[in-house]
Amino acid sequence: MFGRGPSKKSDNTKFYEILGVPKSASPEDLKKAYKKAAIKNHPDKGGDPEKFKELAQAYEVLSDPEKREIYDQYGEDALKEGMGGGGGGHDPFDIFSSFFGGGPFGGNTSRQRRQRRGEDVVHPLKVSLEDVYLGTMKKLSLSRNALCSKCNGKGSKSGASLKCGGCQGSGMKVSIRQLGPGMIQQMQHACNECKGTGETINDRDRCPQCKGDKVIPEKKVLEVNVEKGMQHSQKITFEGQADEAPDTVTGDIVFVLQQKEHPKFKRKGEDLFVEHTLSLTEALCGFQFVLTHLDGRSLLIKSNPGEVVKPDSYKAISDEGMPIYQRPFMKGKLYIHFTVEFPDSLSPDQTKALEAVLPKPSTAQLSDMEIDECEETTLHDVNIEDEMRRKAQAQREAYDDDDEDDDHPGGAQRVQCAQQ
């Protein structure tokens, strides 16, 4: 991140005044002043939360030699421009705890009551349409980090740890470079000495089981209950089963259902759709067929006597759709979409037989004179989707050609003669 030192030096005394020390104060003087004022103004003892925050912000800047140098030279504005907050990016309770650990008041501090929450772990879970129709149980084996049982997540045999000297317990380091007059570059990164934990453990005191890492890998088997009627993208949550870490509220493991396509049935919410093709005879004279449902039942589907099924029509069967989630005895509808298959041609005898039983044409027969006055046409078969696709492609190509002509008006580019 880049920042430009202000041309007019801003206030560089405020942080010293907050701590009540002179600008020449030593690091030890800063520590003493902060500890005394922080205990007095701690919110758990009825102190002013804003004052407590200001003390932490001031001490965080002045206790860091590099930040203090920038503050003394350019003032608070330089830190704001370079770091986005005047050096107050850390929780004031973290800074306070680095002095007193669990707190000087014999109880939990406000910081301890607000433990950091670990990240949730999200896994996609593929399920079939049969799985969410019938319901199923899936056992899944997962790896996660668990607190070391030998040291209770302390990382050491004694349970003690030391504040990292490289980052003063903050877990972060700031690198600062001078790029030019009034230009500085500041970058914040995890401390490489403590890996961002703010603590170090004596090599001789390291836990023999976790080697000081505080956590160990473990295998965990979860039984995931996929209930009837669950939807695509619905979540199944196992609270507190994600990676464990010290002083952290464990996150959740979340499974997100990914419903696979079914070769026969299509699902839309609580309803199911299926395609069925009838011959022209079946559409006109009646039909019956067997449909195997998702649970293996055989459904007899048949038309009513004298019923004619039109092309592209739908029929519905109540209570044969999807079970409704958490109301498994209620179901949506099963819709059947009918397509009618017509013969490619008819013989003269077939045509006469059909004319004898089918309704007469709605349009009157044309006379020979009327036919003679008309222009004769020829019909040919066409795949309308392919036809439209070809037309769209031709239009795109023509549009591209127009763009090329606009780039080179008048056809080929002319070479300009140099003036004599």
UniProtKB/Swiss-Prot annotation:
Induction: A heat shock at 35 degrees Celsius for 5 hours resulted in a 5-fold increase in levels. A lipid is attached at residue 417 (S-farnesyl cysteine). Its main location: membrane. CXXCXGXG motif repeats lie at residues 148-155, 164-171, 191-198, 207-214. The keyword Phosphoprotein does not apply. Keywords: Chaperone, Lipoprotein, Membrane, Metal-binding, Methylation, Prenylation, Repeat, Zinc, Zinc-finger. It is a lipid-anchor. A zinc finger (CR-type) spans 135-219. Plays a continuous role in plant development probably in the structural organization of compartments. Belongs to the DnaJ family. A/I subfamily. This is Chaperone protein dnaJ 3. It comes from Arabidopsis thaliana (Mouse-ear cress). The lineage of its organism: Eukaryota, Viridiplantae, Streptophyta, Embryophyta, Tracheophyta. The gene is ATJ3.
